[in-house]
């Protein structure tokens, strides 16, 4: 069975939704990897860049390290979660019946196929990870319910990052889940499928060619 990649948005940090989503994910009846957002850690990089005037190139590395920090925080929230920085760490976690939480810095910081820009967030890095491990499905967990099922419109609305259409593999199926999906999952364990809205790839001309 191919793994599912799940990006847990940094905006959930400090909210009850984070605990509830973790409770859902650790009961999954399929192998998955949790990709942490940057959250408040990445926001501090943005704030520091305005005062210290370091380059976007440096900010890119710092934002990925911010994902590491949030990932470490997530991994402490349940005994079934396990920090993972490499593909072999994922395999080891799955064999042990655990859910790996990706700390992306060791794999992603030097990757030449990842643009070094604020246009790349944890959304795009999660899509990139799908390609690295052969995952067919990507679930993005957001704090809002998307108003549209069209990827181009979600980019325009700022729901997903501008580089996601380009980073998303041709065969990767994208789902987005917000609060309404979480409410429907409460008390329904284990998670055996992929929750969330299936996002279509229409109207992408002029959006994915960045």
Residue ranges and their predicted role:
Residues 1-210:
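C-terminal catalytic "cap/lid" subdomain
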């Amino acid at each position: 069975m191919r793994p599912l990649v799940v990006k847990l948005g940094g905006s959930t940090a400090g909210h009850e939704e984070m605990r509830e989503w973790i409770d859902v994910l650790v009961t999954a009846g399929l192998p998955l990897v949790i990709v942490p957002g940057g959250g408040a850690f990445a926001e501090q990089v943005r704030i520091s860049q305005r005062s210290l005037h370091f380059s976007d190139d440096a900010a890119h590395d710092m934002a990925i390290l911010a994902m590491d920090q949030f990932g470490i925080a997530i991994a402490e929230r349940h005994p079934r979660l396990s920090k993972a920085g490499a593909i072999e760490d994922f395999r080891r976690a799955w064999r042990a019946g655990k859910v790996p939480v990706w700390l992306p810095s060791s794999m992603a910081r030097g990757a030449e196929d990842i643009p070094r820009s604020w246009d790349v967030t944890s959304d795009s890095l999660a899509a990139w990870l799908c390609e690295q491990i052969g995952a067919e499905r990507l679930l993005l967990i957001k704090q809002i319910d998307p108003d549209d099922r069209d990827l181009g419109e979600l980019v325009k609305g700022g729901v997903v990052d501008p580089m996601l259409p380009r980073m998303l593999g041709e065969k990767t199926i994208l789902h987005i889940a917000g609060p309404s999906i979480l409410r429907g999952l409460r008390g329904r364990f284990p998670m055996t499928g992929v929750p969330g809205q299936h996002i279509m790839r229409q109207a992408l001309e002029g959006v994915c060619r960045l």
